[in-house]
Design a protein with these regions (language model features):
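Long, terminal "pre-/pro-" and other extracytoplasmic accessory regions
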Residues: 2-13, 17-168
Protein backbone atom coordinates (compact mmCIF):
# COMPACT_ATOMS: atom_id res chain seq x y z
CA UNK A 1 0.00 0.00 0.00
CA UNK A 2 1.35 3.41 -1.00
CA UNK A 3 0.95 6.22 1.53
CA UNK A 4 1.22 8.99 -1.08
CA UNK A 5 -2.48 9.15 -2.06
CA UNK A 6 -3.45 9.41 1.61
CA UNK A 7 -0.91 12.17 2.21
CA UNK A 8 -2.17 14.01 -0.88
CA UNK A 9 -5.78 13.85 0.37
CA UNK A 10 -4.73 15.11 3.80
CA UNK A 11 -2.74 17.98 2.26
CA UNK A 12 -5.66 18.87 -0.02
CA UNK A 13 -8.04 19.00 2.97
CA UNK A 14 -5.61 21.20 4.93
CA UNK A 15 -5.30 23.55 1.94
CA UNK A 16 -9.07 23.81 1.50
CA UNK A 17 -9.62 24.43 5.22
CA UNK A 18 -6.87 27.05 5.30
CA UNK A 19 -8.42 28.87 2.33
CA UNK A 20 -11.80 28.89 4.08
CA UNK A 21 -10.28 30.29 7.29
CA UNK A 22 -8.42 32.97 5.32
CA UNK A 23 -11.63 33.95 3.52
CA UNK A 24 -13.46 34.21 6.84
CA UNK A 25 -10.63 36.32 8.29
CA UNK A 26 -10.76 38.56 5.23
CA UNK A 27 -14.53 38.98 5.61
CA UNK A 28 -14.08 39.73 9.31
CA UNK A 29 -11.45 42.37 8.52
CA UNK A 30 -13.77 43.94 5.92
CA UNK A 31 -16.63 43.89 8.44
CA UNK A 32 -14.55 45.59 11.13
CA UNK A 33 -13.25 48.23 8.72
CA UNK A 34 -16.68 48.92 7.21
CA UNK A 35 -18.60 49.04 10.48
CA UNK A 36 -16.61 52.08 11.58
CA UNK A 37 -18.12 54.14 8.75
CA UNK A 38 -21.71 52.88 9.16
CA UNK A 39 -23.90 55.72 10.45
CA UNK A 40 -26.75 53.44 11.50
CA UNK A 41 -26.64 51.19 14.54
CA UNK A 42 -28.06 47.69 14.50
CA UNK A 43 -30.76 48.89 16.89
CA UNK A 44 -31.80 51.62 14.43
CA UNK A 45 -31.89 49.06 11.62
CA UNK A 46 -34.26 46.85 13.64
CA UNK A 47 -36.51 49.84 14.37
CA UNK A 48 -36.68 50.79 10.68
CA UNK A 49 -37.51 47.20 9.73
CA UNK A 50 -40.57 47.19 12.03
CA UNK A 51 -42.60 48.83 9.26
CA UNK A 52 -42.33 45.56 7.33
CA UNK A 53 -43.00 43.13 10.19
CA UNK A 54 -41.53 41.96 13.47
CA UNK A 55 -37.72 41.95 13.39
CA UNK A 56 -36.58 38.44 14.32
CA UNK A 57 -32.81 38.88 13.82
CA UNK A 58 -30.34 41.32 12.36
CA UNK A 59 -26.71 41.61 11.44
CA UNK A 60 -24.03 43.61 9.76
CA UNK A 61 -22.28 41.21 7.41
CA UNK A 62 -19.99 40.87 4.43
CA UNK A 63 -21.58 38.79 1.70
CA UNK A 64 -19.93 38.34 -1.69
CA UNK A 65 -17.38 40.95 -0.63
CA UNK A 66 -20.09 43.56 0.07
CA UNK A 67 -20.80 45.08 3.49
CA UNK A 68 -24.50 45.24 4.34
CA UNK A 69 -27.08 45.44 7.11
CA UNK A 70 -29.58 42.57 6.93
CA UNK A 71 -32.72 42.18 9.05
CA UNK A 72 -35.03 39.15 9.04
CA UNK A 73 -38.67 40.05 9.65
CA UNK A 74 -41.80 37.99 10.24
CA UNK A 75 -45.14 39.23 8.95
CA UNK A 76 -47.91 36.76 9.76
CA UNK A 77 -46.62 33.44 8.39
CA UNK A 78 -44.26 35.06 5.86
CA UNK A 79 -40.57 35.77 6.40
CA UNK A 80 -38.47 38.34 4.55
CA UNK A 81 -34.89 39.54 4.55
CA UNK A 82 -34.58 43.31 4.40
CA UNK A 83 -31.42 45.08 3.35
CA UNK A 84 -31.10 48.45 5.06
CA UNK A 85 -28.79 51.18 3.79
CA UNK A 86 -26.47 51.56 6.80
CA UNK A 87 -25.92 55.26 6.06
CA UNK A 88 -29.38 56.57 5.11
CA UNK A 89 -31.69 54.10 6.86
CA UNK A 90 -33.66 53.34 3.72
CA UNK A 91 -34.82 49.80 2.97
CA UNK A 92 -33.02 49.13 -0.32
CA UNK A 93 -34.27 45.61 -0.94
CA UNK A 94 -36.73 43.10 0.46
CA UNK A 95 -36.60 39.42 -0.44
CA UNK A 96 -38.92 36.63 0.69
CA UNK A 97 -37.07 33.92 2.59
CA UNK A 98 -37.66 30.67 0.72
CA UNK A 99 -34.41 28.67 0.91
CA UNK A 100 -34.79 25.81 3.39
CA UNK A 101 -31.79 26.69 5.60
CA UNK A 102 -32.71 30.36 5.87
CA UNK A 103 -36.40 29.54 6.26
CA UNK A 104 -35.68 27.06 9.06
CA UNK A 105 -33.54 29.68 10.82
CA UNK A 106 -36.30 32.30 10.48
CA UNK A 107 -38.91 29.90 11.89
CA UNK A 108 -36.65 29.00 14.83
CA UNK A 109 -35.93 32.67 15.56
CA UNK A 110 -39.61 33.58 15.34
CA UNK A 111 -40.54 30.71 17.67
CA UNK A 112 -37.98 31.90 20.23
CA UNK A 113 -39.49 35.38 20.18
CA UNK A 114 -42.94 34.05 21.11
CA UNK A 115 -41.54 33.58 24.65
CA UNK A 116 -39.80 36.98 24.69
CA UNK A 117 -40.99 39.73 26.98
CA UNK A 118 -38.58 42.36 25.67
CA UNK A 119 -37.61 43.35 22.12
CA UNK A 120 -34.38 42.49 20.37
CA UNK A 121 -33.52 46.18 20.44
CA UNK A 122 -33.91 46.25 24.24
CA UNK A 123 -31.71 43.14 24.53
CA UNK A 124 -29.02 44.77 22.38
CA UNK A 125 -29.21 47.97 24.45
CA UNK A 126 -28.66 45.95 27.65
CA UNK A 127 -25.72 44.07 26.13
CA UNK A 128 -24.10 47.28 24.90
CA UNK A 129 -24.64 49.06 28.24
CA UNK A 130 -22.84 46.19 29.96
CA UNK A 131 -19.89 46.38 27.55
CA UNK A 132 -18.54 49.91 27.45
CA UNK A 133 -17.22 51.00 24.05
CA UNK A 134 -18.69 48.03 22.16
CA UNK A 135 -21.09 48.21 19.24
CA UNK A 136 -23.63 45.55 18.25
CA UNK A 137 -22.83 43.60 15.08
CA UNK A 138 -25.59 40.99 15.20
CA UNK A 139 -28.48 39.67 17.24
CA UNK A 140 -30.03 36.21 16.99
CA UNK A 141 -32.77 34.90 19.27
CA UNK A 142 -32.93 31.28 20.39
CA UNK A 143 -34.40 29.02 23.03
CA UNK A 144 -31.98 27.79 25.68
CA UNK A 145 -33.31 25.38 28.28
CA UNK A 146 -36.82 26.53 27.34
CA UNK A 147 -36.03 30.22 27.85
CA UNK A 148 -35.79 32.92 25.17
CA UNK A 149 -32.33 34.44 24.85
CA UNK A 150 -30.63 36.73 22.37
CA UNK A 151 -27.10 36.07 21.24
CA UNK A 152 -25.58 39.51 20.68
CA UNK A 153 -22.22 39.83 18.93
CA UNK A 154 -20.38 42.99 19.97
CA UNK A 155 -17.34 44.71 18.49
CA UNK A 156 -14.82 47.17 19.92
CA UNK A 157 -11.85 47.90 17.69
CA UNK A 158 -10.85 44.42 16.54
CA UNK A 159 -12.18 42.64 19.63
CA UNK A 160 -15.39 40.68 19.10
CA UNK A 161 -17.38 39.00 21.84
CA UNK A 162 -20.68 37.21 22.18
CA UNK A 163 -23.10 38.14 24.96
CA UNK A 164 -26.19 36.09 25.80
CA UNK A 165 -29.02 38.33 26.93
CA UNK A 166 -32.31 37.08 28.39
CA UNK A 167 -35.41 38.08 26.45
CA UNK A 168 -37.66 37.28 29.42
Amino acid sequence: MKPRPIIFVIMLNVTICSAHVALSASNQHTLIRSLVSAKLSLQQGLTLAQRHGQPISGKFEVEDGKFQLSVYVANKEQFSELFVDYNTGKIVKSEPITQSGDLDAAKTQSAALTKAKITLRAAIDKAVRGSWGFRAVSVTPALKDGHAIASVVLLKGEEMKNVEQSLE
